[in-house]
């Protein structure tokens, strides 16, 4: 029982045996197991039994208590030599430098609060993976710093032989712990130590942040010069002067079709900061601009520009391949625009099956690849027109997808109005061509364009008028470099600026937005998230930009509801009544667009164009405005053609349509036909200015689809009654479509495409040949049609020519009919007396036509071309077999809706063209010369009717 007696007074300093005298190690605590350090009254040196058995490092955290928790006499007693080996020396020996475990005195509470307030600077909100990584990086920097101190401390400590006595082993650690826990140091000294550790931790965090900034500065943003590129120099592929000439020519001739490159980058020196965009512009410009037209040396054979184009394209491929690794230097707006440029203007290699690493073992050798002769590829069999288009669509789909992903990552879509427009137009167009779901389709549903015009009441603080521009003016223009760029862009441009009312023009708004995106939003850290750079106000789009977005929005909706099959959402069927219901939904959308943006439909005026004006900034701005008007006209009319062409999809196997349904269908078909004509008329206006050869691929495809729809109407009208659908024939007869006019349109389009060909591989060259071949094949059908009685072939009297058809006995006077109102150089199409479902259409070529109800609206030069057509048909070059039944009866058997027939039917015509051997260049040139001679009269007629610009 004596063992259970309380200790005597001499041993009052001893601790109760029930109280734990040591902590468990971190490993044992994490597994919630007993940490065995021997007897409680005589613990041994770490590691514990479990860590020693598992060969783990035995680590202890510091004591959670404070120094004031122990009575002074206990501290003094612990320091007595009689105790020698206490638990405290073990705790102090294993104390971690982690700040949160350091005991604080009562006088150190304010220091703790100070740390909590200052330490929040690096406690990031873990809202994303990137924030989490930044947090871990800072924490790792702090721990690494402390770990390095421990390593240095361990290396500086002289190792001592291990003794069985605990006192000899931990004497130095005990002495250090006693110093920290002595009464004299429990207040001031402890506070100073804590403050030192606080300052050390905060300084460590600051150093970590500075270190991350320094890492970002290891490779600073390069300041490139034009001479720095490997392919530019006196003995290189291009000289500096030649590169500048090509860039200036691009912005004069090609950029107006694609006005989405920031104004600051029109300067070659600024453009050189973006290597991939710089090279992309040089590549496409070299193909479309022979050097001799720029006053440069084009080689002895006159093909040096083609050689430069091919070699620059190989160089561009290397740059493009490097962008997939998400290198910081490639994550720029220049990369986004470079990808889109190659979708608008394809390289020549799109027409060839180029060797790559998968089918050419020599390309595995880097040296062999660099020295491979590009000219040998010209001898390979090239892709046909349709094959080249398919490859172009695939390339556009992939490049546009990469551009959209990068723009989303960097926040360009939210920050830049130009990037927003170009990504939505290119991505939606490529998705439609590939029959895929658009990546940006959802953004149309949440987009608010603020369709009302921007009006300024004279108050400069009006945020509805200024928006982000006020932010830009306050934050950007005070910078001297920004002022200098402003001066360079707008000097000698004669920009219309109203100084009295302080109006901002569209050009100035675009400049400020571009300046923010290029030089401010990502200038410090290109790894920041996109949401960190969103300007304080929503994007402000110009009037023309909003018009383009609205058109592509309607097209996107039409594609998903009419044509899209991937998600089983196609609403169009062979049931014409159902199709008419679908079209009735889109009619108000198109008419609403026209009522809002009618003033933008300004045809191109006959202003002289010359490459010598490429250094004239005013001429460049004027060119952009003029071509932009034609672009909007083309976009609007293609939207109508894309949607209303569905009205000609009639299934003859189902029940016949009644009169009202035929008239309604004819109304839509006529709008589609006139839209196709207006697209071709727009192309002719641009061609008269010598600008059509610079048009992007998107324009070429729309021209081809327009002429294909016209050919479909022609073949349906002139086809045999047994092969064609009678309802479709009746619809076309009511649509006031002239057969004579249709044949002339096909011929003129073939000549226009041939003249717009920049080289022998361009798509225009291929389709011009196909259309000329089609004209030769259509001659017998044309002759047989002309031999019919006039009432049976004249498209201007469709009702009288069909007295014996199913329309007989119908009272047509009670049905809605067409009327036209001509004014302000615009032709307004309405439906009277009660309906007005569609559009007031812009057609400058039909200004002199007469008001009709039963007559078709025919251009005045059509009748004068009858003699020309007869001469063409009697020419010996037109002698040969007529169109086969497979070609003419295609539309009766095909179930393609809308414009889906264009690609397979065009491929069929192209195959027949190749099989018949009419691809011979001599025969092609002879046909072209014949067509040109007959077309000169048309040009004289058109020139006698000049188009005035508002």
From Swiss-Prot:
Identify the InterPro entries for this entry: AAA_Catabolism_Regulators, Zn2-C6_fun-type_DNA-bd_sf, Zn2Cys6_DnaBD
Q: Which UniProt keywords apply?
A: Branched-chain amino acid catabolism, DNA-binding, Metal-binding, Nucleus, Phenylalanine catabolism, Transcription, Transcription regulation, Tryptophan catabolism, Tyrosine catabolism, Zinc
Q: List where in the cell it is found.
A: Nucleus
User: From start to end residue, where is composition biased (Low complexity)?
Assistant: 843-854
Residue ranges the UniProt entry marks as DNA-binding:
25-58
Which residue intervals are annotated with compositional bias (Basic and acidic residues) in the record? 801-810
* Gene Ontology biological process terms in this record: aromatic amino acid family catabolic process; branched-chain amino acid catabolic process; L-phenylalanine catabolic process; L-tryptophan catabolic process; positive regulation of transcription by RNA polymerase II; tyrosine catabolic process
Q: Does the keyword Hydrolase apply?
A: no
Under the cellular component aspect of Gene Ontology, which terms does the record hold?
A: nucleus
* Principal subcellular localization: nucleus
The protein's GO terms of the molecular function aspect are: DNA-binding transcription factor activity, RNA polymerase II-specific; sequence-specific DNA binding; zinc ion binding
Q: Where is this region: Disordered?
A: 154-177, 791-810, 830-857
Q: Per its UniProt entry, which superkingdom is the organism in?
A: Eukaryota
Q: Its biological function?
A: Transcription activator required for the expression of genes involved in the catabolism of aromatic amino acids such as the aromatic aminotransferase II ARO9 and the phenylpyruvate decarboxylase ARO10.
Additional record remark: Present with 319 molecules/cell in log phase SD medium.
* Protein name as annotated: Transcriptional activator ARO80
What species is given as this protein's source? Saccharomyces cerevisiae (strain ATCC 204508 / S288c)
Q: List the gene name.
A: ARO80
């Amino acid at each position: 029982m004596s063992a259970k007696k309380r200790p005597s007074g001499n041993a009052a300093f001893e601790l109760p045996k029930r109280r734990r005298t040591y902590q468990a190690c971190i490993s044992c605590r994490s597994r919630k197991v007993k940490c065995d350090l021997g007897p409680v009254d005589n613990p041994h040196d770490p590691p514990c039994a479990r860590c020693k058995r598992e060969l783990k490092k035995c680590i202890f955290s510091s004591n959670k208590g404070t120094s004031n928790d122990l009575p002074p006499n206990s501290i003094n007693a612990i320091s007595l030599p009689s105790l020698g080996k206490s638990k405290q020396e073990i705790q102090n020996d294993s104390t971690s430098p982690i700040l949160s475990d350091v005991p604080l005195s009562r006088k150190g509470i304010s220091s703790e609060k100070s740390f909590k307030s200052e330490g929040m600077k690096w406690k990031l909100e873990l809202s994303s993976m990137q924030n989490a990584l930044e947090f871990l990086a800072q924490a790792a920097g702090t721990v690494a710093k402390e770990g390095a101190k421990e390593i240095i401390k361990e290396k500086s400590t002289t190792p001592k032989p291990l003794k069985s006595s605990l006192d000899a082993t931990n004497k130095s650690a005990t002495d250090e712990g006693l110093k920290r826990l002595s009464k004299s140091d429990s207040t001031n000294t402890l506070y100073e130590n804590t403050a030192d550790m606080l300052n050390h931790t905060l300084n460590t965090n600051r150093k970590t942040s500075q270190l991350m900034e320094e890492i970002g500065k290891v490779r600073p943003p390069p300041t490139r010069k034009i001479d720095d590129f490997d392919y530019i120099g006196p003995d290189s592929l291009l000289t500096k002067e030649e590169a500048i000439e090509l860039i200036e020519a691009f912005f004069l001739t090609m950029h107006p079709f694609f006005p989405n490159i920031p104004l600051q980058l029109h300067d070659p020196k600024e453009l050189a900061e973006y290597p991939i965009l710089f090279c992309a512009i040089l590549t496409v410009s070299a193909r479309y601009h022979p050097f001799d037209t720029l006053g440069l040396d084009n080689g002895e054979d006159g093909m040096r520009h083609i050689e430069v184009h091919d070699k620059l394209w190989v160089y561009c491929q290397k740059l493009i391949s490097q962008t997939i690794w998400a290198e910081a230097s490639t994550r720029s707006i220049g990369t986004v625009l470079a990808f889109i440029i190659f979708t608008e203007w394809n390289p020549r290699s799109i027409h060839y099956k180029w060797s790559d690493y998968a089918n050419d073992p020599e390309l595995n050798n880097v040296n062999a690849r660099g020295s491979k002769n590009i000219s040998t590829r010209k001898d390979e069999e090239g892709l046909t027109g349709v094959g080249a288009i398919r490859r172009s669509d695939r390339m556009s789909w992939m490049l546009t997808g990469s551009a959209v992903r990068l723009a989303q990552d960097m926040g360009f879509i939210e920050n830049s109005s130009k990037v927003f427009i170009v990504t939505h137009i290119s991505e939606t167009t490529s998705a439609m061509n590939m029959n895929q779901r658009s990546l940006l389709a959802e953004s149309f549903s949440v987009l608010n364009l603020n369709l009302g015009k921007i009006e300024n009441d004279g108050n400069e603080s009006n945020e509805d008028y200024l928006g982000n521009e006020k932010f830009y003016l306050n934050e950007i223009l005070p910078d001297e470099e920004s002022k200098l760029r402003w001066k360079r862009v707008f000097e000698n441009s004669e920009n219309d600026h109203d100084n009295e009312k302080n109006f901002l023009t569209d050009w100035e708004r675009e400049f400020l937005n571009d300046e923010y995106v290029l030089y401010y939003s990502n200038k410090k850290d290109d790894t920041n998230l996109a949401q960190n750079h969103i300007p304080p106000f929503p994007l402000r789009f110009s009037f023309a930009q909003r018009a383009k977005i609205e058109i592509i929005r309607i097209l996107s909706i039409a594609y998903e509801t009419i044509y899209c099959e991937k998600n089983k959402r196609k609403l169009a069927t062979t049931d014409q009544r159902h199709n008419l219901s679908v079209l009735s939904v889109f009619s108000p959308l198109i008419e609403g667009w026209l009522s809002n943006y009618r003033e933008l439909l300004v045809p191109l005026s006959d202003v002289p164009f010359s490459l010598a004006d490429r250094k004239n900034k005013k001429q460049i701005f004027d060119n952009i405005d003029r071509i932009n008007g034609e672009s909007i006209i083309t976009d609007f009319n293609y939207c109508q053609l894309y949607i209303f062409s569905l009205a000609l999809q009639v299934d003859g196997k189902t029940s016949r349509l009644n009169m009202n349904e035929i008239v309604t269908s004819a109304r839509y078909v006529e709008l589609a036909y006139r839209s196709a004509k207006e697209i071709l008329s727009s192309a002719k206006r641009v061609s008269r200015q010598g600008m059509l050869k610079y048009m992007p691929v998107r324009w070429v495809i729309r021209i081809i689809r327009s002429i294909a729809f016209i050919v479909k109407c022609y073949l349906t009208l002139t086809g045999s009654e047994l092969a064609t659908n009678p309802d479709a024939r009746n619809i076309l007869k009511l649509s006031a479509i002239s057969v004579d006019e249709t044949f002339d349109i096909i011929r003129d389009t073939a000549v226009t495409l041939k003249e717009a060909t920049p080289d022998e591989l361009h798509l225009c060259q291929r389709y011009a040949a196909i259309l000329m071949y089609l004209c030769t094949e259509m001659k017998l059908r044309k002759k047989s049609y002309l031999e019919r009685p006039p009432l049976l072939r004249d498209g201007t009297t469709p009702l009288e020519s069909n007295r014996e058809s199913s329309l007989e006995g119908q009272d047509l006077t009670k049905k809605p009919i067409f009327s036209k109102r001509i004014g302000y150089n615009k032709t307004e199409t309405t439906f009277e007396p009660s309906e007005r479902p569609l559009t007031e259409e812009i057609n400058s070529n039909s200004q002199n036509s007469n008001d009709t109800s039963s007559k078709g609206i025919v251009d005045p030069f059509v009748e004068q071309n009858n003699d020309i057509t007869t001469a063409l048909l009697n020419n010996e070059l037109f002698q040969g077999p007529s169109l086969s039944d497979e070609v003419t009866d295609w539309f009766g058997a095909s179930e393609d809706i809308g414009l889906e027939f264009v690609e397979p039917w065009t491929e069929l015509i192209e195959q027949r063209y190749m099989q018949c051997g009419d691809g011979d260049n001599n025969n092609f040139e002879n046909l072209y010369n014949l067509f040109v001679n007959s077309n000169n009269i048309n040009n004289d007629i058109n020139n006698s009717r000049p188009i005035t610009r508002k």
